[in-house]
């Protein structure tokens, strides 16, 4: 009886992990394909700290489900920002997107 219960518990855990992974994959897909305009588009750049985001006075967009801090530039960085190209998203999301893209290839 105990073995049956443990087996059932393992199956439930596996089902939960698979469902969670599919949910994350949908979020990554939304990040890649669905964008909306940022607040203040074309005024301050992609976030409150325009210099840090290397996007001064250029239009920017955000993933559909995100906050402004995850904006991306729609035009190349200002020439004075060369070598400091803006991260499109926070480092952890950027890492996950890279892994997601590699897994599709």
Swiss-Prot record:
Cellular component GO terms, alphabetical: extracellular region
One MF annotation (Gene Ontology) recorded for this entry: ion channel regulator activity
Annotated signal peptide: 1-19
Tissue spec. comment: Expressed by the venom gland.
Disulfide bonds: 38-55, 46-60, 54-73, 62-71
Cell compartments where the protein resides: Secreted
Residues the record lists as Arginine amide modifications: 82
UniProt entry keywords in alphabetical sequence: Amidation, Cleavage on pair of basic residues, Disulfide bond, Ion channel impairing toxin, Knottin, Neurotoxin, Secreted, Signal, Toxin
Highest taxon in the source lineage: Eukaryota
Pro-peptide region(s): 20-36, 86-105
Protein function: Toxin active against insects (S.frugiperda larvae). May act on sodium (Nav) or calcium (Cav) channels.
Comment, domains: The presence of a 'disulfide through disulfide knot' structurally defines this protein as a knottin.
UniProt record similarity statement: Belongs to the neurotoxin 28 (Litx) family.
Protein name, entry field: U1-sicaritoxin-Li1b
Organism: Loxosceles intermedia (Brown spider)
Lineage of the species this protein comes from: Eukaryota, Metazoa, Ecdysozoa, Arthropoda, Chelicerata
